[in-house]
Amino acid sequence: LVLTSSSASGNYYPVQGSLGGYSSYNSYTGAGYQLRCVREQTTAMPKGRLEGPRAVLIGNSITEVWQGRTDNKTFFSDNDYLPKGISGQTSLQISARFYNDVIVNDPACVVIACGVNDLAENDGQPCSIERVFADIRLMAETGAARGFKVVIGSTPPANRIWWQSEEWNAAHADLGQRVVELNRLLKQYAEERGFVYADYHSALKDDQNGLKLEYSWTPDDRVHPSAAGYAVMEKILKKAVDKALFDPNATDGDGQIDDLDKWEGWE
């Protein structure tokens, strides 16, 4: 897979379409579902933030249940973050609602984090890491074209899927390494495009590339974070969003994000 630093030209936004019979991935890099140009509809839309939230978080169940499981119940309201997660969704399904959940809300920053449900084959089909990466890249380019700052969250660690059978998990014993490889692509892409990469994975993983037991919602889950896991993620997320928006009041947290000291020319 060859990564480039080219950005999407013009205002091309994903629109909801049928998951059946969608176009192949070579019709538009990273598409995987039908796109149409809505240039005529968006020329009248003002650029920049109006009254939107500081950040919209788009993702899967890890995003959806965050507010209910964190011990910091005012984390999202205090930081003006709007979570838009839907349990069980793949990156393809998440990208299909990018317009309604992100663009319509007009945030200053978009945080994109997904991938585990693709690798868990929630749609019943084998999935390559390149396909997941392509969907995430499309969302990132769409957000950047709209004028949003972009944060790409790593896929959190997982080396087994509790809702799949033991036979399935045995046949997918390389899951943890596949998550690592997906995150490598995401990090490299974020570096090339000047986006911020929020590295949840490194902070949450055990020595088997699974979710650390103390950060797992239950001992048998090992996919969804506990309150302690979300506390770690909150530090990483806030620092990432602050850096993406060049907040002069940003302070270091205990989490990790990519290459903070290399940024120059802040205004």
Tell what function each PLM region has:
Residues 1-44:
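C-terminal, surface-exposed recognition/capping segments
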Residues 42-109:
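Serine-esterase "nucleophile elbow" of acetyl-processing enzymes
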Residues 74, 143, 189-190:
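A generic structural signal for well-ordered alpha-helical segments
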Residues 84-89, 114-119, 123-124, 155, ...:
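Cell-envelope and extracellular/periplasmic
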Residues 89-96, 126-136:
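Glycine-rich anion/phosphate-binding loops
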Residues 110-115, 133-140, 144-153:
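Conserved, well-ordered alpha-helix/loop/beta-strand core segments that scaffold catalytic motifs
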Residues 157-267:
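Catalytic His-Asp segment of secreted/periplasmic serine-dependent ester chemistry enzymes
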